[in-house]
Each structure stands twice: as C-alpha cells, then as structure tokens.
C-alpha cells in the first residue's frame, strides 16, 4: 500500500510518521507514505496557492491548478483520490476496510483556508469527513484516515487484536483491566479472575452490547439488524 498526502504543511506529519506502529509499518515495507507540498506545483511566481472568492465572501479559496497538477504527477491506474472536507461522507471502519481490500494507492488531499475551488470534484473520486465538526485544516483528518487504513494492513497489528476491537461486528470494545486488583475501592470484576474462558467471553460480549447500546444506539441498531 502507498499513501500520498498533498498538503501545504508537510512538516506537521513528521512526528506521526516517525513513531510507533506507523514507523514500524514503514520500516517493514508494509506501507509507503509520501507527503507532498502541493505549493511546489504552482506556476505563481510568489508561490501563492489561494485566491479570493468569486461572488465575494469570507476566507481565501485554494486554487485548482496546483492541486490538479500534483494529482496528475503522482496518480496511477489504481489510485483512489480523496479530499478531506466537512462536507464529505463520514469516514468509518467499514470504509477503512474497503480501502485496504480495493486500493494499492490512496491519494489524500488535505484542505486549508476556506476550502477548495469546487471544480476539484472533477479530478477526485470522493470526499470524506471525520465527523460533524470543523478543523483548521485537513492535516489531522488525513492522518486519521491513513492511520485507520494502515493498521489494517497484513502484519501491522496482530489479527487477534483486530478481531476484538471497537466496530468489529458493529460493537464497541469491551472494558479491560490490569493490576492492581483493587484501586481506591474499585475492584476488577470477579469473573475475569475465574479462569473460565467461556464465561469470560460471554461477559465481555454482554459488556460490548451494553456499552454500544448506551453510547452508540445507531451502531447498536446495525448490530441487531446484522444478527437477523
């Protein structure tokens, strides 16, 4: 898998790439990540990539020429080009799984300022949001989407860990505990100390259902529908 990120601020990705699971995935050749400053593709002598809106309005708009030039420079036959924007479809675990199974190369365009010239839609495949809120730029969403995809690649995380995670089968993850056994009067549930594997598995499943029903009723309904 290769992930190309087009951003005006490539330095913001340095720490994310150099640490923990993402760094190991890169070292093990499980993923290639390139962060490209699309300012390099502008023909403006002052390296400007934004301009005022036609029709007036607050905020500057990203010009289309440098972004399209950058896309064309790196796009291949199996590239999937996406734009991070609050106007997009909300990204979720199911989409992350689809990305892994369908694409070898994902290009993520991280927005900034007031957004993109609307004509960018002729040159991309989809728009995605990471939630119903607005951020100062698309750098964090591009990292979130990339991270969610990379951890699903073969060998990046153990299969047993992925099987019990939140959103697997539309359920949130179960509670976990470690030492000490008792902390300020709060004790680890006795059933987890029983050594009875089936009872522990049943308890954890019940906890998943309870937590999902309380915190994510929309997800719980999908779980119920999937059981039918």
From Swiss-Prot:
Cell compartment(s), UniProt: Cytoplasm
Pfam families: tRNA_m1G_MT
GO MF terms, alphabetically ordered: tRNA (guanine(37)-N1)-methyltransferase activity
Class of enzymatic activity (EC top level): transferase
Residues binding S-adenosyl-L-methionine, per UniProt: 111, 130-135
Transmembrane segments: none
SUPFAM superfamilies (UniProt xref): alpha/beta knot
InterPro entries named in the record: Alpha/beta_knot_MTases, tRNA_m1G_MeTrfase_C_sf, tRNA_m1G_MeTrfase_TrmD, tRNA_m1G_MTases_N, tRNA_MeTrfase_TRMD/TRM10
Catalytic activity: guanosine(37) in tRNA + S-adenosyl-L-methionine = N(1)-methylguanosine(37) in tRNA + S-adenosyl-L-homocysteine + H(+)
Gene Ontology CC, one term: cytosol
One GO BP annotation of this record: tRNA N1-guanine methylation
UniProt keywords, alphabetically: Cytoplasm, Methyltransferase, S-adenosyl-L-methionine, Transferase, tRNA processing
EC number: 2.1.1.228
HAMAP family for the chain: TrmD (MF_00605)
Family of the protein in this entry: Belongs to the RNA methyltransferase TrmD family.
Protein function: Specifically methylates guanosine-37 in various tRNAs.
Subunit structure: Homodimer.
Protein name: tRNA (guanine-N(1)-)-methyltransferase
Organism: Ureaplasma parvum serovar 3 (strain ATCC 700970)
């Amino acid at each position: 898998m290769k992930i190309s990120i087009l951003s005006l601020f490539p330095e913001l990705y340095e720490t994310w790439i150099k640490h923990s699971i993402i760094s190991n995935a890169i070292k093990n050749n499980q993923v290639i990540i390139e962060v490209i400053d699309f300012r390099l593709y502008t023909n403006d002598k002052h390296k400007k990539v934004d301009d005022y809106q036609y029709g007036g309005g607050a905020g500057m708009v990203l010009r289309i020429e440098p972004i399209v030039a950058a896309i064309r420079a790196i796009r291949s036959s199996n590239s999937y080009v996406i734009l991070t924007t609050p106007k997009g479809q909300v990204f979720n675990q199911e989409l992350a799984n689809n990305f892994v199974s369908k694409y070898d190369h994902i290009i993520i365009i991280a927005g900034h300022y007031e957004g993109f010239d609307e004509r960018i839609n002729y040159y991309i495949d989809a728009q995605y949001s990471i939630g119903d809120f607005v951020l100062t730029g698309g750098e964090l969403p591009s990292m979130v989407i990339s991270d969610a995809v990379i951890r699903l690649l073969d060998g990046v995380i153990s299969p047993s860990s992925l099987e019990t995670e939140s959103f697997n089968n539309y359920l949130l993850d179960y509670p976990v505990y470690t030492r000490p056994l008792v902390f300020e009067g709060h004790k680890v549930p006795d059933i987890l100390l029983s050594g009875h594997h089936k009872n522990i598995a049943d308890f954890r499943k019940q906890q998943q259902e309870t937590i999902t029903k309380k915190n994510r009723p929309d997800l719980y309904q999908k779980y119920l529908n999937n059981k039918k």
